[in-house]
């Protein structure tokens, strides 16, 4: 897919674009994002974004292919994924965690696991999960925000 003229969405850009529940140099955790507000989202993600749709529906184009986000849809945008919003319902919303390339390079992950996950989401970046699995993902997000709040520097603590 041709990527000329597409804005790159870095961690800093995401921090300024969204209200954040937590952010650092390497990670942004958003509270509920209203997808309808992302009408000019066409961007090339730098890093990896993992999210889950909570309510409503949104039709987005990912690397030129149409996808529909419904409640309990898990989505992963890999490095250099081109994301374009086409249409979103009034109530479409979800949570996202975005990790920077520097952070991903700093952690040690079993290569076999990483490659299998990466290739699994290349062709289909949106996966419908069971309500119980979605609830589990929401609980993990809440736990992350809680733990990060306890350890966050004072400047970030008020953002959590």
What are these regions (language model features)?
Residues 66-68, 82, 126:
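Well-ordered beta-strand positions in beta-sheet-rich domains
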Residues 155-160:
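An accessory alpha-helical subdomain
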Residues 53-55, 78, 88:
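A short, compositionally biased micro-patch
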Residues 31, 50, 74-76, 96-98, ...:
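Conserved hydrophobic/aromatic beta-strand scaffold that supports enzyme active sites
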Residues 75, 79-85, 104:
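Histidine-centered metal-chelating micro-motifs
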Residues 2-23, 86-151:
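A hydrophobic/aromatic-rich effector-binding and dimerization subdomain
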Residues 66-78, 114-119:
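A short glycine/small-residue-enriched secondary-structure motif
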């Amino acid at each position: 897919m041709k990527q000329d003229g597409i804005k790159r969405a870095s961690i800093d850009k995401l921090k300024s674009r969204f209200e954040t529940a937590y952010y650092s140099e390497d990670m942004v955790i958003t509270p509920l994002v209203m997808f309808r507000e992302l009408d000019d989202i066409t961007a090339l993600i730098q890093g990896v974004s993992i999210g889950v749709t909570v309510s409503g529906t949104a039709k987005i184009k990912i690397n030129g292919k149409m996808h529909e986000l419904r409640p309990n849809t898990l989505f992963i945008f890999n490095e250099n994924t081109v994301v374009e919003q086409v249409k979103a319902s009034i109530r479409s919303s979800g949570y996202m965690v975005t990790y920077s390339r520097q952070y991903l390079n700093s952690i040690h992950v079993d290569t076999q696991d990483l490659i299998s996950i990466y290739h699994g989401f290349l062709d289909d970046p949106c996966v419908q999960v069971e309500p119980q699995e979605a609830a589990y993902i929401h609980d993990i997000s809440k736990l992350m925000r809680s733990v990060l709040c306890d350890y966050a520097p004072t400047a970030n603590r008020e953002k959590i």
